[in-house]
Design a protein with these regions (language model features):
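Beta-propeller domains
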Residues: 1-375
Length: 375
């Protein structure tokens, strides 16, 4: 279940903390400090020797405080750990989180005062493991999804758990506070384990896991009464959401997602065919299709130079890397976030082909060079 425990070679996602570019893995491996220009590896990041375990990808930096909020998980009780690192890269808070057993969380959400942790009914079949020693992960639709809301610096017993309809969630869009309520938007999977298509032959099982249903969804949790509200916002198949990072943990309206066609719409795997700007309150959207045989990547938001959180939420640019499979040439497309459906305002031809897909991150040039100086 866990990458570090199984000694797996891993592909990596990324994160920034204390001016350092960190290479992270969702199956919980060691965080590695790498050079942002050369990608040279400097070694594991240990927060001055205080980090004694692995770190999952999708740890989050609160830009208002500079704090890194993280979690990790494993095969042994209590199965999850939650923590906070300071803007200086110091481990300032860490608590165990009790789960019913080994789980496969992928992301977390945060607000100015709380962190939202995930416990999904997606875990290994214990009967198969005991009989054959094989780790077969299954979706258990009779088990509720749980979201644990903990004060940012709360103890283990401060977690409040909320039960919701069974599902899986790869990526949170954003979370915020509204009085006694915590609101979380994300791209929900009603059933994360798809049936193989015989037409795919020997690759059927692998392709099935890359052909998933994602739906824009909203959860609301009342910290005072324990009430839960949840509803579908829109069913267009999109994922890999990105928001204006200045709005992380604050009330937001827009998310920039990738359209991934379903099998009945001609989709065969996780290929990003269009960029979609959603209004998350209404489910309305505008869309830009990349074109036949052209596939994109996750599209980070770059705030306009000098923009502040008080400015318009879509005051900035959205960027994506595309590859044309007929020529194997790649470009960086730059969109005005306020007029996405009008198409890119600039195209930058890249000197070599890039693999399409996830994940990407926007980092200001001055932050890149600051990170280099700290290497």
């Amino acid at each position: 279940v866990i990458g570090a425990a199984l000694n797996l070679r891993t592909t990596k996602s990324d994160g920034m903390c204390n001016g350092k570019l960190l290479s992270l893995w969702y199956n919980a491996g060691e965080p590695y400090h790498i050079d942002p220009l050369t990608l040279d590896t400097y070694g594991p990041e240990t927060f001055d020797g205080h980090l004694k375990h692995t770190l999952s990808a999708h740890s989050k930096v609160d830009l208002n405080t500079g704090e890194l909020l993280f979690f990790t998980y494993g095969n042994k009780a209590p199965y999850m750990t939650y923590g906070v690192a300071s803007p200086l890269g110091e481990l300032v808070h860490e608590v165990p989180i009790d789960l019913p057993g080994p789980r496969l969380p992928h992301d977390l959400g945060f607000t100015p005062n709380y962190t939202i942790l995930h416990d999904f009914p997606v875990f290994q079949d214990e009967a198969v493991f005991k009989q054959a020693g094989k780790r077969i992960v299954r979706f258990h639709p009779d088990v509720p999804t749980r979201y644990g809301i903990i004060p940012r610096f709360g103890d283990s017993d401060a977690v409040t758990w909320f039960e919701c309809d069974p599902c899986y969630l790869l990526h949170v869009i954003n979370c915020w506070e509204e009085g006694d309520w915590i609101v979380m938007d994300g791209c929900r999977q009603p059933d994360p384990v798809n049936k193989p298509d015989a037409a795919d032959g020997d690759l059927a099982s692998m392709l099935a896991q890359r052909r998933r249903v994602f739906q824009l969804y909203r959860w609301q949790f009342n910290l005072k009464t324990g009430e839960v509200r949840e509803h579908l916002v829109d069913d267009l198949n999109t994922e890999f959401p990105m928001i204006n990072p200045l709005y992380g943990g604050r009330r937001s309206q827009f998310t920039y997602n990738q359209y991934i066609p379903l099998l009945e719409d001609g989709g065969r795997t996780l290929k990003f065919e269009a960029l979609v700007k959603y209004h998350t309150d209404t489910g309305t959207y505008e869309r830009w299709d990349y074109g036949p045989g052209i596939y994109g990547s996750e599209a980070p938001f770059a705030p306009r130079l000098g923009a502040a959180a008080a400015d318009a939420e879509d005051d900035g640019y959205v960027l994506t890397m595309t590859t044309d499979v007929s020529t194997w040439r790649s470009e960086c497309l730059i969109f005005d976030a306020g007029a996405l459906s009008q198409g890119p305002i600039a195209r930058v031809k890249l000197p070599q082909r890039l693999p399409t897909g996830f994940h990407t991150r926007w980092v200001r040039g001055e932050d890149i060079y600051q990170a280099c100086q700290g290497c």
